[in-house]
Curated annotation (Swiss-Prot):
It comes from Streptococcus suis (strain 05ZYH33). GO terms for molecular function: undecaprenyldiphospho-muramoylpentapeptide beta-N-acetylglucosaminyltransferase activity. It catalyses: Mur2Ac(oyl-L-Ala-gamma-D-Glu-L-Lys-D-Ala-D-Ala)-di-trans,octa-cis-undecaprenyl diphosphate + UDP-N-acetyl-alpha-D-glucosamine = beta-D-GlcNAc-(1->4)-Mur2Ac(oyl-L-Ala-gamma-D-Glu-L-Lys-D-Ala-D-Ala)-di-trans,octa-cis-undecaprenyl diphosphate + UDP + H(+). This is UDP-N-acetylglucosamine--N-acetylmuramyl-(pentapeptide) pyrophosphoryl-undecaprenol N-acetylglucosamine transferase. Pathway: Cell wall biogenesis; peptidoglycan biosynthesis. CDD domains: GT28_MurG. GO terms for biological process: carbohydrate metabolic process; cell division; cell wall organization; lipid glycosylation; peptidoglycan biosynthetic process; regulation of cell shape. It is found in: Cell membrane. One of its GO terms (cellular component) is plasma membrane. The keyword NAD does not apply. Belongs to the glycosyltransferase 28 family. MurG subfamily.
Length: 354
């Protein structure tokens, strides 16, 4: 039986593509393994998926670009993670390793390279993060959402890999009619999506301006915090959704989102009006700011700095999007930067030598 190892974690964005590819390998009879942090979001997501995946937990550390005593400890954690990964991969003897990035992916990538296992990695952002900069040195091939410098000879530019448009599931979740009964059909609907680590700013904005917002809009707020769950007049707040995600997206006139590339390209593929509020440099390396500027320059989106986000500025930006809806939708419709999961899977299998 052929075997493949997946790795990647730390945020949902470092797991999503793996969970889209894994079922295709399982359907072809592959034995699938996943190396990550047993206490990380990758383990949680793999378990939630219900997929037949063998999960292996390793030590992980975050290498920082600035001096920190924590770095010294984390170097040892990464080293131990490499030793653990060497043992795991040597026992599995896989045909390939696929990495979606995040610091937990560095030890398995290094170990696979040392064991002469082909390593395939994916980079979603405009510029590589530190983890993938390290991983690139050990990779067989890197696939990128955005074009990368020609000097990176192992890179294949594939565009954004998204599942949008690949499902015909039109089943109405049982919660949807109840939600709709609380909404005013004459008002536009705003959907706030903060991702696994960026919802707090949106949550605070809505909590502080709930009455004013719900006078003008139906508000859907994916909070990541179950203590905020609420269904009221023109307001639906929920911590997490699965089968409701696409129906709620379909309801929205405008989506207010962070700047993660996975979410951005899903919105572009759906031709969904959106306002980007990227995570600032105090909370990230600035990749979301770069993604947001890129999307705005392409005419797909509008973006606003987190420090400038207020009730008043939100009204201005949403009004601008709605007034020029045709412009943004047409630009998204003309995008050639989207690739289906099936197309990417076929490319990956071809590069793996089938």
């Amino acid at each position: 039986m052929k075997k493949i190892v997946f790795t990647g974690g730390g945020t949902v964005g470092h797991v999503t593509l793996n969970l889209l590819l894994i079922p295709r390998f399982l359907e072809e009879g592959w034995e699938v393994h996943y190396i990550g942090d047993g206490n990380g979001i990758e383990h949680e997501q793999v378990v939630k998926s219900g997929l037949d995946v063998h999960f292996h937990s390793i030590a992980t550390g975050k290498l920082r670009r600035y001096f920190s005593f924590q770095n010294m400890l984390d170097v040892f954690k990464v080293g131990f993670g490499v030793l653990q990964s060497l043992t795991i991969i040597a026992k599995i003897r896989p045909q390939a390793l696929f990495s979606k990035g995040g610091f937990v992916s560095v030890p398995p990538v290094i170990a696979a390279n040392l064991l002469r296992v082909p390593v395939f990695i994916h980079e979603s952002d405009l510029t590589m993060g530190l983890a993938n900069k390290i991983a690139y040195k050990f990779a067989t091939t890197m696939y990128s959402t955005f074009e990368q410098p020609a000097s990176l000879t192992k890179v294949k530019h594939v565009g954004a890999v998204t599942k949008v448009g690949q499902t015909n599931d039109k089943v109405t979740p049982i919660q949807l009619p109840e939600i709709l009964s609380h909404f005013d059909k004459s008002l536009p609907t705003l959907l706030f999506v903060g991702g696994s680590g960026g919802a707090k700013v949106f949550n605070d904005l809505i909590s502080q301006n709930s009455a004013a917002l719900t006078e003008r809009f139906n508000i859907i707020n994916l909070t990541g915090d179950s203590s905020l769950n609420k269904l009221d007049k023109n307001l639906y707040r929920v911590d997490y959704v699965t089968e409701l995600y696409q129906p709620l997206m379909d309801l929205a006139d405008v989506v207010i989102t962070r700047g993660g590339s996975n979410t951005l390209f899903e919105l572009i593929a759906m031709q969904q009006l959106h306002l980007i509020v990227p995570l600032g440099r105090q909370a990230s390396r600035g990749d979301q700011i770069e993604n947001a500027l890129y999307a705005e320059k392409k005419g797909y989106s509008k973006q606003i700095d987190e420090s400038q986000l207020t009730f008043a500025s939100l009204l201005v930006e949403v009004d601008e999007l709605l007034k020029h809806k045709e412009f943004y939708v047409q630009n998204m419709a003309n995008s050639n930067e989207i690739q289906s999961v099936d197309s990417f899977y076929n490319l990956l299998r071809e590069d793996m030598g089938r």
